[in-house]
């Protein structure tokens, strides 16, 4: 069941990455990528941004135009502003509905591809051994624990393998995070040291002047 071993492990990796990055961040990134595709929603987003810029520009022109001295021009700008604002609000409302539907779809897919998938695999393959242990390698009490709840004795169940994957992925991810942070800190210190070496200190400059 090598393929099942890999599927369970990858599902835990994906879950860890989503939890580390943040589900909201992932949703926003997917939304931005979705808006890059040629579809009606992306065209609505482009039109919404255009109308927003037009509203801001007209508002600036209205502020720079006197409503008393240049009433005709100001009234014309006001009508254009109100019309653009109305269109912008309509596009913004439509885009908000699209984003709500998109977020719901993404959350559903994320649940069924991570948590839902793990629950299904653990239920469907509860009697399927992930791999067999060498005979007599561990006491039978340990074999019973490793095969819990329904796998044959002397094998490792999918529930136990899933727990091992959770622990290993979490520890590996935390260790990798510490390594990356230490590397970033070292690079930052080196950059500061090079900057300080390239600049003469103030006491030395004063000595040269004296």
Swiss-Prot record:
Segments on the Cytoplasmic side according to the record's topology features: 25-110, 173-210
Q: Does the keyword Heme apply?
A: no
Q: What is its main location?
A: endoplasmic reticulum
Q: Where is the protein situated, by its record's location annotation? A: Endoplasmic reticulum membrane
| Coiled-coil stretches noted in the UniProt entry, renumbered to this chain | 43-97
Q: Which GO terms describe its biological process?
A: tail-anchored membrane protein insertion into ER membrane
Annotated membrane topology: Multi-pass membrane protein
List where the protein spans the membrane. Answer: 5-24, 111-131, 156-172
Question: At the top level of its lineage, which domain of life is listed?
Answer: Eukaryota
* InterPro entries xrefs: Get1, Get1_fungi, Helix_hairpin_bin_sf
Pfam families cross-referenced by the UniProt entry: CHD5 (PF04420)
Quote a single Gene Ontology cellular component term: endoplasmic reticulum membrane
Which keywords label this protein?
Answer: Coiled coil, Endoplasmic reticulum, Membrane, Transmembrane, Transmembrane helix, Transport
Self-association and partners: Interacts with GET3.
Q: What does this protein do?
A: Required for the post-translational delivery of tail-anchored (TA) proteins to the endoplasmic reticulum. Acts as a membrane receptor for soluble GET3, which recognizes and selectively binds the transmembrane domain of TA proteins in the cytosol.
Its recorded name reads: Protein GET1
Organism of provenance: Uncinocarpus reesii (strain UAMH 1704)
